Amino acid sequence: MARVKRGVIARRRHKKILKLAKGYYGARSRVFRVAKQAVIKAGQYAYRDRRQRKRQFRALWIARINAGARQNGLSYSRLIAGLKKAAIEIDRKVLADLAVNEKAAFTAIVEKAKASLA
């Protein structure tokens, strides 16, 4: 049986990791052992932050809606309760966009929510 050395496979593995580490600072982009750790950690951060992004955007939308609602004399929670009572189904992403870019439309929605609460 012939002796099989792993040079080709090792090079392929190293190249794959170093390609993923391209753009990293210093040894993290040049030294395989360090690059491998950096790539693994980057993957962990990416996995975690894909989930955090959803939470962070929802929090941002709520903050924007709350600011817009308070300009119209209503708190965020009262606005959402009013929208539910009025059977207006607009998600927070769209509401936040309206609060920032279409103030007149947002004010009209707030007035409908107020009317359903009264």
From Swiss-Prot:
Stored CDD domains: Ribosomal_L20
A GO term for molecular function: rRNA binding
Any one GO CC term of the record: ribonucleoprotein complex
Database matches in InterPro entries: Ribosomal_bL20 (IPR005813), RIBOSOMAL_L20_CS (IPR049946), Ribosomal_protein_bL20_C (IPR035566)
GO BP terms, alphabetized: ribosomal large subunit assembly; translation
Keywords: Ribonucleoprotein, Ribosomal protein, RNA-binding, rRNA-binding
Task performed by this protein: Binds directly to 23S ribosomal RNA and is necessary for the in vitro assembly process of the 50S ribosomal subunit. It is not involved in the protein synthesizing functions of that subunit.
Family, similarity comment: Belongs to the bacterial ribosomal protein bL20 family.
NCBIfam families from the UniProt entry: rplT_bact
Name of the protein: Large ribosomal subunit protein bL20
Taxonomic lineage from the root: Bacteria, Pseudomonadati, Pseudomonadota, Gammaproteobacteria, Pseudomonadales
